[in-house]
Amino acid sequence: MCVFSSIICSTILSTSARESSEFLDNITNMQIAITSTSLLIIIIISYTLAQRKCTSTTLQDFSIWKYISAITLVGVVSYSIMNGVRAKVGNTPPGIAASGIDRTLWGTYVSVQAKAQLGDRIERLLSPKHLEGTTIKATFADPVDIVVILGETARADFLSAYGFKHSTTPVLDSLIAEGDAFCFNDARCAANSTIESSKRIFTLWNDRPGLEWCDFPNLMSCFSRAGYRTIWYTNQETEGPFSVERMFGKTVDLLRTPYGKSGGVVTRVGFDEEILPVIGKFNDSLQIRQPEKKSGQLSIIHLMGSHYQYSLRYPSKFNHFKKEDVIRKNGSTANAKVAEYMNSILYTDYVLGAIYALYRERPALIVYLSDHGESLYDSPDQPDLCGHGGRPTLEQADIPFVVMLTPSFRKSYPALSKRIYDSRFRPISTAWLTNTLTLTAGIRTRYSDDRYDFFGEKFNPPTQRTTQGEGGKALYPPVKIKRVK
């Protein structure tokens, strides 16, 4: 049972054409049958009442549509009260109790207010005051590429690079064997939803109490101050309250998508490989158009990754895994979805390899991480959950974090390359990424902290890693086993 709240309402208001299409594709025959049957029963009862001869003049004036409206309203209110009472006496968890009419109105109001406030937060994010006192002591003697690949909904334990029994990351496994890449053994996402996670990934906020994400320097503006070209490539929508690109798009020199002016909002978002020619085109043209920026280039690449609906994330030739290949059995339908998820990981691996190939002949430091993980019918508290959000779970918090260093980067900066490689068994949080990358490049703001620099020699975080979710933060113990090479 869904609880109507400001979160649900915000989702409805910000839903794009792509998401609407995927929602309709996911409606089951059983759901259609239940809805149709309920409507039919209401119509039959209303028609019967409308045909009856009543002594009451008021009831005689009732049309069938008035009966339908009245019965529906009574049903909704009664069901809401019933579930509220059941939740209060402990027969059902409060989280699945139906909401009242007051929450419907309040949730709508809150979501509309939140949408209006987003513009204000974006303006605050762009304030030049955030960078006051910033010092630059360049680490790199020559221009380099710093690349952050933001994946979607990938969990670490489904990658063969992290020990998964099936070969879901053959390209990455090969890069690791060749010495071009390595994985961090224990990385936690800062939040279990894309927007909340991105607020922490791309700023120096680090959940400082009493302040908001938009009151701190962001990764892109920091690198721009240091003389880097900045560009954001995306295979996701560029508009809407739930769009990362809407939040951070103004912080970069260029925002590019395969979908032109539509930005993927009205057109259907395709496979992640469609972004590859866009990356190649603008990587070369930026060097010509902005020759004054000598430090190099910061590129953010936002993939669709394993975003639900999984089967829409990869071409048919990547339909490799079947439900019989699923290790943890959960029934035919669930196993089929998990197999589709495995295929989406396999396809993302292919895309990562193709992106690396675009930068391989240049000095580049490339980081791939996921915004959050995914529950796949394996959450102890919610065994039927396939998705993310709400209360955090370990499956949603445990994400892959991969570093790829090109041969020319390793040759030019051997000590730094070794230091980054040696840090792969540190327990890290994606909330510390902006702090780490800026300090690595020699960019120091008044909010920088060497203790949170997980590539650095002084790494010693004074706070524990947490994953933000609905209702608060969750804390999970470090990974105790060695999962990566």
Place the predicted regions along the sequence by residue:
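Membrane-interface soluble catalytic domains
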Residues: T48-Q51, V74, Y79-I81, S221, ...
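Active-site-proximal alpha/beta segments of enzymes that process anionic O-linked groups
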Residues: S78-V148, T153-R328, D398, S429-T430, ...
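A long, amphipathic alpha-helix that forms part
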Residues: G133, P277-Q287, E324-Y368, R424, ...
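Active-site rim elements
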Residues: N206-G210, G263-T267, A334-I345, D349, ...
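Flexible internal linker/loop segments at domain or repeat junctions
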Residues: K317-N335, S408-S417
